[in-house]
């Protein structure tokens, strides 16, 4: 019974946020700190490479940054056919930012909480993408861009026409069309945010459960899971980026 109780307390401790306020208006400070930290790391590294970049033989870091840049740039050109100065930087920012946030999950479960405890902080959850507020907030930003791009390219009349005149062309079925299209539109940011949250939350939980096992089982299970989780970390960042580009491309195309 004591083991069950201690295991429950351990899990609860690792899933408790450092919050400011209570209820709906509470703010998870730990998530905000980690989001800003990885964001500043991203900006700092890319700025460093941009300033010190050479035209000769590039170093390893510069090669890695250039490969990442070309990978995202080619993907954007392939999906988003219209010339737009925002989409490329947006896609690169989303991919690298989400990837860095997800990569925090590869740190030992007790590493960051142990560090924060030295400063008197009892609860500190270090994986921002496992906080539903972060992925959903990012998805909400994408949703606003979708609406903005739709209105920019099709106008209010075109947007309303798109919501009401398909898939059924008969005027009596326009209300049905509107309901179906509205559900489709709203489901995009919801699925985008919850997909990232669900995968990272599940991965975090598995690491926590492995940490509760005897030390010899921890090594036997954590290493294979960490290696597999690297793929999840990359894929979730890739999927979030690709779907963002696809949704924005759809917002600029005529149906």
UniProtKB/Swiss-Prot annotation:
It comes from Photobacterium profundum (strain SS9). The keyword ATP-binding does not apply. It is found in: Cell inner membrane. This is ATP synthase subunit a 2. The keyword Cell inner membrane applies. Key component of the proton channel; it plays a direct role in the translocation of protons across the membrane. It holds the Pfam family ATP-synt_A. SUPFAM superfamilies: F1F0 ATP synthase subunit A. Belongs to the ATPase A chain family. Its main location: membrane.
């Amino acid at each position: 019974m004591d083991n069950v109780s201690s295991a429950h307390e351990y899990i609860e401790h690792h899933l408790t946020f450092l919050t400011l306020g209570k209820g709906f208006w509470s703010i998870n400070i730990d998530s905000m700190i980690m989001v800003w930290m990885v964001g500043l790391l991203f900006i700092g590294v890319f700025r460093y490479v941009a300033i010190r970049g050479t035209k000769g033989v590039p170093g390893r870091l510069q090669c890695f940054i250039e490969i990442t840049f070309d990978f995202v740039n080619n993907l954007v050109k392939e999906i988003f056919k219209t010339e737009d100065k925002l989409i490329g930087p947006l896609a690169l920012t989303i991919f690298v930012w989400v990837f860095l946030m997800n990569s925090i999950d590869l740190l030992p479960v007790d590493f960051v909480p142990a560090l924060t405890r030295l400063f008197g902080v009892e609860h500190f959850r270090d994986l921002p993408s496992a906080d539903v507020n972060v992925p959903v907030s990012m998805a909400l930003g994408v949703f606003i861009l979708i609406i903005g791009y739709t209105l920019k390219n099709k106008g209010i009349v075109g947007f309303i026409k798109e919501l009401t005149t398909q898939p059924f062309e008969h005027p009596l079925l326009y209300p049905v069309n509107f309901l179906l299209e509205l559900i489709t539109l709203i489901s995009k940011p919801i699925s985008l945010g919850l997909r990232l949250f669900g995968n990272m939350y599940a991965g975090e939980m598995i690491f926590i459960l492995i940490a509760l096992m005897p030390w010899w089982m921890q090594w036997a299970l954590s290493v294979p899971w960490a290696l597999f989780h690297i793929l999840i970390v990359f894929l979730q960042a890739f999927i979030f980026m690709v779907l963002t580009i696809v949704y924005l491309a759809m917002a600029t195309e005529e149906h």
